[in-house]
Amino acid sequence: MQNIDLICVGKLNAPYFAAGVAEYQKRLGAFCNFRIIELPEAAIADKSASDAQISKALDKEATAILSSLRKGEYLAALCVEGKQFSSEELAKLIADRANSGAGDIAFVIGSSHGLADSVKKSRQRKSCPMGRITMPHQLARLVLTEQIYRACTINNGMKYHK
């Protein structure tokens, strides 16, 4: 069974987001070994942090993210620089990885400051924006978990996706 990881920087505090994520996580168990890895957000002293302070925090988060990856795991980073994709294209990405014999894939959601370049360039084959809108990272986690579930139902010929 394929391993799919969702690596997230920051906690999921809102109970309504947590309930939604838990529901899709449970459903995903029928299709893959799905795990969520929650990493702490690096502390930044004040709201008016310098670019250097933010960069240092992102580097600290990057170290934790990269050490969380399985050996040979394909990394898909959620960041604005990437090409947008449809649910069907996400399903194809997941299926292609599963069929390649090296099926492990990790989706990464960074902190509110984004992701360090070292994460974007390390083993990454995809940058996956969630559209051109801005949303809270907790909501992004729920939306991405649902989209991974949707992709799995597409790949298994189920009628969830219309």
Q: In which residue ranges do the predicted regions lie?
A:
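N-terminal beta1-alpha1 ligand-phosphate binding loop
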Residues: 1-28
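Conserved beta-strand scaffold positions in the cores of enzyme catalytic domains, especially
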Residues: 36, 75-77, 125-127
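Short glycine-rich anion-binding loops that position phosphate/pyrophosphate groups of nucleotides
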Residues: 12, 80-83, 111-114
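A generic structural motif
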Residues: 29-35, 73
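Loop/turn-to-beta-strand initiation segments
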Residues: 3, 103-108
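S-adenosyl-L-methionine/SAH cofactor-binding core of RNA-modifying enzymes
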Residues: 40-105
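General small-molecule cofactor/ligand-binding pocket signal
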Residues: 7, 35-37
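Structured adenosyl-cofactor binding patch, chiefly the S-adenosyl-L-methionine
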Residues: 117-162
